[in-house]
């Protein structure tokens, strides 16, 4: 048994070595990433100005106003309402530092990542304490709010300055990370284009004190915790102003809680993901997690916060049915990811069955069917992955559309995330398919023959009979 496992590990390592040294240009190369690095922060300011200062409408030049005057006006508004104040710097970086301390010192579990070819097959250890950090963060936020030390809706009132701090922090940390990697000589899979390499990153596994893995820390905690706190702040703001919380805000609070909670409770399963294993720590990951996700995905929250509940009121019965549908899709999404990750963990002989909330039925498959591949890995073709190859992506799109739909159609900004994310998820699905076809060859083609559906299964009729449901 041990010799078989060792042989499989060696096959995985040999296959990973070829992909680990392969150099590709994505996003249009250096010109494309330059446009992204300049354009996206500007888009964030434009959306903020429209959401807050134009009542959710698109800022456009007034009659007779030149484009030069209009752009100057936008810059003036950004400077006046989104200047990165000392208060905003203090709030943002206190949060980051405390979350970092929680990463290191709160209760958690240990895990090991994939074998890294550039480290001779070494598996890096990971300490996963996001669940403890998550619930302590919620408790601390509520204590600060109700004691009056820091009202949580300050995050809404000071959103402009906080967004600017997040943008500046994302750029600053990206510069430090890139220069640090070059100075220490730990750059990896470089293309020779400083602009492109700055965007994609230079270092693969940056760490602090040997344990705080920056990629995992930024991806799991920072964006989703901030997004939830913004929505919680909106709920508390409404409670103070109206004496109740609108059902639409409660719906969004539920949605953002479930997503952030899922990221925290499944942290030890993320350590073998593509982001942890392959993506380098550059502007793309750093800026996106520090600023892009929390400060642009939140426009559904901002719309609800800045408008009277009567302007986006849904029929309570429709809202209730919608919430039930959302919970069903969450169950599919959570168990789909769980089945995949448990299968990978079982394949490597290391599983940790944590009793974190919520515990859902069918989170893993007993005696799953799989297709062996030339790499030593196997392709799961049971459970949700026996019905469609990207069911979890379908759920992601449903979530995104729900976040926009809850606000109605009076503003385009809450729909930025659903539109952007849908395009991104389609691109990611195509990328995943191409990579899997290249990596697994005929085994992947066999999987496509067995499971011809990509996003939506043709029938759920035989769901209880395909695999044994397991709590």
Curated annotation (Swiss-Prot):
Segments passing through the bilayer: 33-53, 89-109, 130-150, 159-179, 216-236, 244-264, 282-302, 313-333, 397-417
InterPro entries: ERG24_DHCR-like, Sterol_reductase_CS
Chief location bin: endoplasmic reticulum
Catalysed transformations (reactions): ergosterol + NADP(+) = ergosta-5,7,22,24(28)-tetraen-3beta-ol + NADPH + H(+)
Enzyme Commission number(s): 1.3.1.71
One Pfam family recorded for the sequence: ERG4_ERG24
Class of this enzyme: oxidoreductase
UniProt-annotated location(s): Endoplasmic reticulum membrane
Biotechnology: Inhibition of erg4A and erg4B might be an effective approach for alleviating A.fumigatus infection.
Record's note on what induces expression: Expression is induced in the absence of erg4A.
Gene Ontology, cellular component aspect: endoplasmic reticulum membrane
Keywords assigned by UniProt, alphabetized: Endoplasmic reticulum, Glycoprotein, Lipid biosynthesis, Lipid metabolism, Membrane, NADP, Oxidoreductase, Steroid biosynthesis, Steroid metabolism, Sterol biosynthesis, Sterol metabolism, Transmembrane, Transmembrane helix
Highest taxon in the source lineage: Eukaryota
Sites where a glycan is attached: 15
Record note on disruption phenotype: Deletion of both erg4A and erg4B results in fluffy colonies with severely impaired conidiation and increased susceptibility to antifungal azoles itraconazole and voriconazole, but does not affect virulence. The double deletion leads also to the loss of ergosterol production and accumulation of the ergosta-5,7,22,24(28)-tetraenol precursor.
A GO term, aspect molecular function: Delta24(24-1) sterol reductase activity
Membrane topology field: Multi-pass membrane protein
Function in brief: Delta(24(24(1)))-sterol reductase; part of the third module of ergosterol biosynthesis pathway that includes the late steps of the pathway. Catalyzes the last step of ergosterol biosynthesis by converting ergosta-5,7,22,24(28)-tetraen-3beta-ol into ergosterol. The third module or late pathway involves the ergosterol synthesis itself through consecutive reactions that mainly occur in the endoplasmic reticulum (ER) membrane. Firstly, the squalene synthase erg9 catalyzes the condensation of 2 farnesyl pyrophosphate moieties to form squalene, which is the precursor of all steroids.
Further facts: In Aspergillus, the biosynthesis pathway of the sterol precursors leading to the prevalent sterol ergosterol differs from yeast. The ring system of lanosterol in S.cerevisiae is firstly demethylised in three enzymatic steps leading to the intermediate zymosterol and secondly a methyl group is added to zymosterol by the sterol 24-C-methyltransferase to form fecosterol. In Aspergillus, lanosterol is firstly transmethylated by the sterol 24-C-methyltransferase leading to the intermediate eburicol and secondly demethylated in three steps to form fecosterol.
Protein name: Delta(24(24(1)))-sterol reductase erg4A
């Amino acid at each position: 048994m041990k010799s078989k496992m060792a042989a499989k590990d060696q096959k995985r390592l040999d296959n990973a070595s070829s992909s680990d040294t392969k150099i590709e240009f994505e996003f249009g190369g250096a010109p494309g990433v330059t446009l992204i690095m300049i354009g996206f922060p500007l888009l964030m300011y434009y959306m903020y100005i429209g959401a807050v200062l134009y009542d959710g409408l698109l800022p456009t030049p007034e009659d007779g106003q030149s484009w030069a005057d209009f752009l100057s006006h936008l810059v003036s508004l950004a400077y006046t309402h989104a200047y990165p104040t000392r208060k905003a710097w203090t709030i943002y970086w206190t949060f980051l530092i405390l979350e970092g301390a929680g990463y290191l010192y709160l209760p958690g579990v240990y895990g090991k990542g994939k074998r890294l070819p550039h480290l001779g097959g070494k598996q890096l250890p990971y300490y996963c304490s996001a669940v403890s950090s998550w619930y302590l963060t919620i408790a601390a936020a509520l204590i600060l709010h109700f004691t009056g030390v820091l009202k949580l809706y300050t995050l809404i009132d000071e959103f402009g300055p906080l967004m600017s701090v997040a943008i500046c922090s994302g750029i600053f940390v990206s510069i430090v990370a890139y220069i640090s990697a070059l100075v220490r000589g730990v750059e990896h899979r470089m293309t020779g284009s400083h602009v492109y390499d700055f965007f994609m990153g230079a270092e693969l596994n940056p760490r602090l004190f040997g344990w705080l893995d920056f990629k995992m820390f930024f991806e799991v905690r920072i964006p989703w915790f901030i997004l939830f706190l913004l929505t919680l702040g909106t709920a508390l703001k409404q409670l103070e102003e109206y004496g109740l919380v609108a059902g639409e805000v409660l719906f969004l609070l539920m949605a953002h809680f479930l997503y952030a909670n899922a990221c925290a409770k499944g942290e030890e399963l993320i350590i073998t993901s593509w982001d942890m294993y392959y993506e380098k720590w550059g502007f793309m990951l750093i800026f996106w997690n520090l600023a892009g996700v929390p400060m642009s995905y939140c426009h559904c929250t901002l719309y609800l916060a800045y408008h009277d509940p009567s302007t986006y009121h849904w029929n309570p019965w429709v809202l209730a049915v919608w919430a039930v549908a959302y919970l069903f899709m969450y169950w599919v999404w959570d168990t789909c990811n769980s089945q995949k990750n448990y299968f990978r963990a079982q394949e490597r002989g290391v599983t940790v069955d944590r009793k974190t909330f919520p515990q859902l039925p069918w989170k893993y498959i007993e005696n799953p069917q799989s297709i062996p591949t030339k790499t030593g890995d196997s392709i799961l073709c049971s459970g949700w992955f026996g019905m469609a190859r990207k069911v979890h992506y379908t759920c992601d799109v449903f979530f995104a559309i729900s976040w926009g739909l809850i606000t109605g159609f009076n503003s385009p900004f809450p729909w930025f995330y659903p539109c952007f994310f849908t395009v991104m998820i389609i691109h990611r699905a195509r990328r995943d398919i191409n990579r899997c076809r290249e990596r697994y060859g005929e085994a992947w083609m066999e999987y496509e023959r067995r499971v011809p559906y990509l996003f939506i299964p043709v029938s759920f009729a035989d769901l209880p009979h395909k695999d044994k449901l397991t709590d």
